[in-house]
Regions:
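PLD/PLD-like phosphodiesterase catalytic module centered on the HKD motif
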Residues: 2-168
Length: 168
């Protein structure tokens, strides 16, 4: 049996909380090694994207979570998928069986990927992450997180190992 997993997430500047991003960063390499396709939103591009409708008017900051499973079921909500959220947060989500909504959600994800996201990949020698994006001016490849400063990356590198999983 085969399966495909694709995720669209926000880079450091678009997250509500740097500690949550530090937790996500821990797993990027492993997810890529497992074949997960990672896309990270470029906040500055969301508002400029032509085909995103009301989503394009957002600032590119995220709190909502959405997932489509097998093209039949979707999850939409604000609940994080972690033990702390299950036990302590009052956020929620809806699980809806609807192939039509799943198709719409996947189409939106594809538009975001095409117009306002970098695809995260491993470098050819698999020693580092790279952020790839096609633009009208040509292909762009970055070796540092988009829209992040040296200080932000240093801070995340310092605090990342110190943040316990159950605090994320």
């Amino acid at each position: 049996s085969s399966w495909a997993t694709k995720t669209v997430d926000g880079p450091r500047p678009s997250t509500d909380e740097p500690l949550a991003h530090a937790g996500y960063r821990r797993y990027r390499q492993e997810m890529l090694d497992l074949g997960v396709q990672l896309y990270e939103i470029v906040p500055s591009q969301v508002a400029q994207a032509k085909n995103l409708g009301p989503f394009g008017r957002s600032t590119g900051r995220f709190h909502a979570k959405a997932a489509a499973v097998d093209g039949k079921v979707i999850f939409i909500g604000s609940l994080n998928f972690d033990p702390r959220s299950e036990k302590h947060n009052t956020e929620l989500g809806l699980l809806i069986r609807s192939p039509e909504l799943a198709a719409q959600l996947m189409k939106m994800a594809e538009l975001v990927q095409a117009e306002a996201a970098y695809r995260v990949r491993l470098s050819e020698d698999k020693s580092r992450l790279e952020w790839h994006r096609s633009t009208p001016e040509g292909d762009v490849v970055l070796t540092e997180e988009p829209d992040s400063t040296w200080w932000q990356r240093l801070w995340l590198n310092l605090i990342g190992p110190l943040v316990p999983e159950d605090a994320l």
